Amino acid sequence: MKTFSPTPENINREWFVVDASDLVLGRLATQITHRLRGKHKPEFAPHMDNGDFIVVVNCEKIKVTGNKLADKKYYRHSGYVGGLHEITLEKLLASHPERVLMNAVRGMLPKNRLGRAMLKKLKVYAGPEHPHAAQNPQPLAIKY
């Protein structure tokens, strides 16, 4: 018996759509990351990108627990002296709700070019509409 090693020809990617209404941010992000990496497939290989495409709609209605809306802060730096910018989760949800989920999933993916390729398969939209109807995405049930 030989050990099976997947090749790029063996990869079968599917499209899924997730409605993020009233789902908790971190719990949703872990389920999405699991699918993006392909860890739910029996032919998973850590050195290959064999995950599925995920379309997330209604990201503006996502929930968080505790006082994270006011307390959680996101930081970015322009590269200049004194160029540190911070924004709270509440303000980021009001202005760019899709970035909240993208940041959460990005933190759970590998920090290399494979992780960047996996993140490109995540499509996040604030409202209920998405332009990926031609791919016929199947609804994905989130466990919790």
Swiss-Prot record:
<keyword id="KW-0687">Ribonucleoprotein</keyword>
<dbReference type="GO" id="GO:0017148">
    <property type="term" value="P:negative regulation of translation"/>
</dbReference>
<dbReference type="InterPro" id="IPR005823">
    <property type="entry name" value="Ribosomal_uL13_bac-type"/>
</dbReference>
<keyword id="KW-0689">Ribosomal protein</keyword>
<dbReference type="InterPro" id="IPR005822">
    <property type="entry name" value="Ribosomal_uL13"/>
</dbReference>
<protein>
    <recommendedName>
        <fullName>Large ribosomal subunit protein uL13</fullName>
    </recommendedName>
</protein>
<dbReference type="GO" id="GO:0003729">
    <property type="term" value="F:mRNA binding"/>
</dbReference>
<comment type="similarity">
    <text>Belongs to the universal ribosomal protein uL13 family.</text>
</comment>
<comment type="subunit">
    <text>Part of the 50S ribosomal subunit.</text>
</comment>
<dbReference type="InterPro" id="IPR036899">
    <property type="entry name" value="Ribosomal_uL13_sf"/>
</dbReference>
<dbReference type="GO" id="GO:0022625">
    <property type="term" value="C:cytosolic large ribosomal subunit"/>
</dbReference>
<dbReference type="GO" id="GO:0006412">
    <property type="term" value="P:translation"/>
</dbReference>
<dbReference type="Pfam" id="PF00572">
    <property type="entry name" value="Ribosomal_L13"/>
</dbReference>
<comment type="function">
    <text>This protein is one of the early assembly proteins of the 50S ribosomal subunit, although it is not seen to bind rRNA by itself. It is important during the early stages of 50S assembly.</text>
</comment>
<dbReference type="InterPro" id="IPR023563">
    <property type="entry name" value="Ribosomal_uL13_CS"/>
</dbReference>
<dbReference type="GO" id="GO:0003735">
    <property type="term" value="F:structural constituent of ribosome"/>
</dbReference>
